[in-house]
Amino acid sequence: MDSSIPDPEADLIQLNGSYHTETSPCVIESRVMILLSIIIAFFGLAGNAMVLWLLAFRMRRNVFSVYILNLAGANFLFLCTHTAFSLEKIIVLFHSVHIHIPLLFYTLSTLAYLAGVSMVTAISAEYWLSGIWPYWYQGQRLKHTTTVICTGLWGLALLLSLLEGKSCGFLGSTYNQDVCWKLDFIIVAWLLVLFAVLSRSIQVLLVRIFCGSQRTPVTKLHVTIVLTALVLVICGFPFGIIFYLLYWTTEVYYIMPCNSFHETILLLSYINSCANPIICLLVGSIRHCRFQCGTLRLLLHRAMQDIPEEEGEELEEVVGERVQNSIP
């Protein structure tokens, strides 16, 4: 069973109850959307691979960079699975050759999606708590709390994806429609919990920036987290709601011309998975409202600085002087 991507046909595609030939506007639109999705996915794979490499091997990690590292891994896995699906559709549309993508990829897609949404929610909620109770947060927080949270979120995502994969027939088991529907409903319920926490976190972070006596200096990490969370709300959550809940209502695919609703939601999910590396580079390159170039490592480091911009510049100068003095 295919839980998210309907099988296209090479020569004829049925849209809104009628068949369209290869030269019809709807088929052309479908091909353009798929090609655009693949291009965005390849850029996203490169960006997330860069973040993974830098955070894993080239930079010292802190509390929040661990979340970013796990988010990059989840986004990379999500883009890998859906790039395979998109390439399959391209081959079918252009060459009339059907290839088989293992059903395991659907389970991997669910795992990556749930893990990515959970990581963004966790980093937003933790940053929110660190701003509300800074002294308690700094004094009582255990050293390996972030690692434990990330492990737990990956474990929960793995459990839900395996249960869904088994009941929906993606793991070589028998398809059970009733259990599959219930598992998808549980996934949607978990997504709604994450959405509620994330929305509250964004609200508090924005209020602390702009309102009254609680106004706080805006740090680059603050901006990075808020932008990443907003992109997830706009581009990421629709994918989960559509493909784990509204999938069971087939009429949902006919609400847009040419049945392009499916491709549109997929395109938004690709944008969400590509957004974090772009946000980090943009936030890291802006200094005093101007773009300043730098190495990828430096830009990523700036994007995760949780200190005001002036203090960050002083810190960079001190580090630079130490590096120069250490050179014989």
Curated annotation (Swiss-Prot):
Residue spans, topological domain Extracellular: 1-33, 84-112, 166-178, 246-263
CDD domains: 7tmA_MrgprB
Membrane topology value: Multi-pass membrane protein
Highest taxon in the source lineage: Eukaryota
Compartments in which it is found: Membrane
Annotated GO CC locations: plasma membrane
MF (Gene Ontology): G protein-coupled receptor activity
All ranges on the Cytoplasmic side of the membrane: 55-62, 134-144, 200-224, 285-328
Membrane-spanning parts: 34-54, 63-83, 113-133, 145-165, 179-199, 225-245, 264-284
GO biological process: G protein-coupled receptor signaling pathway
Glycan-bearing residues: N16
Keyword Transmembrane helix among record annotations: yes
Keyword annotations of the record: G-protein coupled receptor, Glycoprotein, Membrane, Receptor, Transducer, Transmembrane, Transmembrane helix
Pfam annotation, one family: 7tm_1
Family statement: Belongs to the G-protein coupled receptor 1 family. Mas subfamily.
Purpose of the protein: Orphan receptor. Probably involved in the function of nociceptive neurons. May regulate nociceptor function and/or development, including the sensation or modulation of pain.
Protein name stated in the entry: Mas-related G-protein coupled receptor member B8
